[in-house]
Amino acid sequence: MSKIESALQAAQPGLSRLRGGAGGMGYRAATTQAEQPRSSLLDTIGRFAKAGADMYTAKEQRARDLADERSNEIIRKLTPEQRREALNNGTLLYQDDPYAMEALRVKTGRNAAYLVDDDVMQKIKEGVFRTREEMEEYRHSRLQEGAKVYAEQFGIDPEDVDYQRGFNGDITERNISLYGAHDNFLSQQAQKGAIMNSRVELNGVLQDPDMLRRPDSADFFEKYIDNGLVTGAIPSDAQATQLISQAFSDASSRAGGADFLMRVGDKKVTLNGATTTYRELIGEEQWNALMVTAQRSQFETDAKLNEQYRLKINSALNQEDPRTAWEMLQGIKAELDKVQPDEQMTPQREWLISAQEQVQNQMNAWTKAQAKALDDSMKSMNKLDVIDKQFQKRINGEWVSTDFKDMPVNENTGEFKHSDMVNYANKKLAEIDSMDIPDGAKDAMKLKYLQADSKDGAFRTAIGTMVTDAGQEWSAAVINGKLPERTPAMDALRRIRNADPQLIAALYPDQAELFLTMDMMDKQGIDPQVILDADRLTVKRSKEQRFEDDKAFESALNASKAPEIARMPASLRESARKIYDSVKYRSGNESMAMEQMTKFLKESTYTFTGDDVDGDTVGVIPKNMMQVNSDPKSWEQGRDILEEARKGIIASNPWITNKQLTMYSQGDSIYLMDTTGQVRVRYDKELLSKVWSENQKKLEEKAREKALADVNKRAPIVAATKAREAAAKRVREKRKQTPKFIYGRKE
């Protein structure tokens, strides 16, 4: 379009205003004009003019397009400072191109306007403008300020027409964008305010634990949400969902929240065109998490409740009887179910389950322990019965062992232990002490069990402890130089020893000196203080005095004609010397000392004599070396075995000189030897016990054979008797089954 045509068209609005018309839509009625004949010259001139105008327009458009490209190049290549400096220096690219400079100023103005509006838009997004007026005032001031600042920054006159045209361009679109953004912000703020108000209102109600626990709390919440959606207090379904989620989250952290959530979960709400329950709206996983939090909060928000809960569980766990603990935990569980009625796992329920598992384990262990204790108790009673029977057999003369290792074992007793023997001994001694019989009878009964006991048995240990205590009482008196007023162990030992001194001496040979002391006080009437003083002198003897005593002792032995002294076993020499010295220093009488020593040796040894007419002594052997079992009197069986062995060896070796064998003890062995040393047979306690056991088995076998023979002798008589009885029984049965009238008499 040419400038002339543009000017003509642009003049019409002005013309309308001059005429006072309203302008309207610019409608004009169509006019027709008769064709005027035109000459070919005029037509040619017109076409020429039009062609020139079109050429000018095309050239101008090309110039403006090139100017647009050049202005873009300048903006791209140069910073604002460089452009300003280039303008001032006259070195700006394409500064001779007026179209390029015009386009540059227009674009600079447009960019400046967009920068200002971008700043305003950012402020809108940040929520700076709470009202429309605030936004408009700020934008107006920024536009005025920005137009000047940006123009000066690029070296352009702020009042430049092209710059102003670019700065003011697209104002409508920019306004729409800014006002729309601010309207959206205000709408969001209004919605947030509504949600905030609703949340504040709900919190005012739901923060009260008593309100949350009320049965109608769920109904209130349901109605509040429904009314809010209807009245617009809750602007949208999305915000309703947000409000509901937030309300449930808040309630779950408060006391009573678990009760509220339990009731409201199945209430219905319509959102986004669908009706669901609140549980379905939140989602099962999230709902369970809320319930766990709510039930945990019951305790976390109530310190006293939490403290009581912990103390109750600890109290239950610390009960000695797991049955009591289990009952307490069941009560705690019932209380917890009231506070946390749902099935979700909470820390409190975990504590309870853990406590229940511990108590169950304790219960299992306790049950097993009780069962074992009951079994042990029954077995203990059975053991005591078995032990008592063994002791009674032994006391009655049967050769049975009373060692716990040799007790008969069955499923009702289990394996025997030394503690079982101790329990039996304590029980039996207590029974004897509680009997209403004289003390002498009690001591006699105790000695029977003592004699029947095994070597290291409980009875011997108990009496041995008493003997040891008595020895310590005397030793303490020797050190102190005076016998105390009370000597309970010595008194008890004196009483029980007087009942059978030989048995006590045989069982505790290392206490021979103590037994001698008691005999000197009780039987010889020597003052205890005299004996104490003598013992103190004996302890304080010098080396020379000991040497003289040794010589005197050897002389006394050599002068004695007693076989027990002449053939004194080496194992008894030290004990014999103690007795000799004790009597000598206490009484000052060497003859009495020899007499007591001889008495001790006769009680502690057995003298073997030959088979000749003279009956010469062939050996002196300690009695305890000949014991075949734990019974002190079993040395007699060992003696008989040695006698049989001696006679058998002599009979099988007739060349032995004088048909005699010498017997002597050395260490733990007993030897039988002829005068030449060619025959030398060794025995010890183990071998004697073995021979005795074999002899017992042979005797038992003979007894069984004899009993069987007696039974076989009686068998025919017994069989005949049984046959007669069976025949008579058959006759009686037959008569019962047969009618009596067939025999000619009807009754």
From Swiss-Prot:
Q: Tell me the disulfide pairings in this chain.
A: none
**Keyword Amino-acid biosynthesis (UniProt):** no
Q: Which UniProt keywords apply?
A: Host periplasm, Viral genome ejection through host cell envelope, Viral penetration into host cytoplasm, Viral short tail ejection system, Virion, Virus entry into host cell
Q: Name one GO biological process term.
A: symbiont genome ejection through host cell envelope, short tail mechanism
- GO cellular-component terms in the record? host cell periplasmic space; virion component
Q: Where in the cell is it found?
A: Virion; Host periplasm
| Organism superkingdom | Viruses
Query: Tell me, how does this one assemble?
Result: Homooctamer. Interacts with gp16; after ejection the gp15-gp16 complex composed of a gp15 octamer and a gp16 tetramer probably binds both the viral DNA and the host inner membrane. Interacts with gp14.
State the function annotated in the UniProt record.
Answer: Component of the cylindrical core that assembles on the inner surface of the capsid during capsid formation and plays a role in viral DNA ejection into the host cell. The inner core is composed of stacked rings of gp14, gp15 and gp16 proteins. Following binding to the host cell surface, the internal core is disassembled and gp15 is ejected along with gp14 and gp16 into the infected cell. Gp15 probably remains associated with gp16.
| Protein family (similarity comment) | Belongs to the T7virus internal virion protein gp15 family.
Protein name per its UniProtKB record: Internal virion protein gp15
Give the organism, scientific name. Answer: Escherichia phage T7 (Bacteriophage T7)
